[in-house]
Regions:
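Charged, gly/pro-rich active-site loop segments
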Residues: 74-154
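Short, surface-exposed beta-edge/turn micro-motifs
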Residues: 13-16, 40-41, 59-62, 130-132
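A short mixed-secondary-structure module that forms the rim of ligand-binding clefts
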Residues: 34-72
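A generic local secondary-structure boundary/capping motif
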Residues: 5-7, 53, 120-125
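N-terminal structural module
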Residues: 1-47
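Short, structured patches in soluble enzyme cores that scaffold and shape functional sites
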Residues: 20, 66-68, 135-139
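Histidine- and/or cysteine-centered catalytic micro-motif in compact active-site loops
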Residues: 21-23, 32, 47-49, 67-69, ...
């Protein structure tokens, strides 16, 4: 299980970069919408259904990355991905996704008004077709600005 500080750092993010690879070794990295953290699982939304989706169908290993801009510590989360595109679990996250979509849209509107930020689109739209990427966290790598790495099995 990941520690509380890392969990909170992940939960504060809206998007996270996911890297995948096809069987010939061709890499692909793309931002994914972070839906939730539950136990040792991250739930991401893939609404493009392109190379990431294709890669994960044949090679379900992925690496996620992000940086804490306050500490400049980078994180890499490695694990196995299950594509959830039907069934009770899929239907169960639809409500959570709709709620998060509303919260994010409200936040963007408030920021736009109070900070004078301009957004081309304040509302976050979730397309009709999407899949959930359920990532089982297996390893967390912490990369410090000093160049030191700390690897931990989850």
């Amino acid at each position: 299980m990941i520690n509380k500080c890392l969990r909170e750092l992940i939960e504060s993010r809206e998007f996270i970069s996911l890297a995948s690879c096809d069987l010939s070794g061709r890499p692909n990295a793309a931002p994914k919408f972070l839906l939730k953290v539950e136990g040792d699982y991250l739930y991401l939304v893939d609404y493009i259904i392109g190379r990431t989706f294709s890669n994960l169908q044949i090679n379900p290993r992925a690496s996620l990355s992000f940086i804490d801009s306050n500490t400049l510590i980078g994180y890499q989360i490695n694990g196995r991905v299950e594509i959830v595109d039907a069934g009770p679990e899929y239907r169960g996250v639809i409500k959570e996704l709709q709620d998060k979509q509303i919260d994010l849209s409200i936040t963007r509107i408030i920021e736009g008004v109070t900070k004078g930020k301009g957004h081309k689109s304040f509302e976050v739209e979730i397309p009709d077709q999407f899949v959930i990427l359920k990532v089982k966290m297996e390893e967390v790598v912490e990369m410090r600005p000093s160049g030191t790495l700390k690897r931990e099995k989850v």
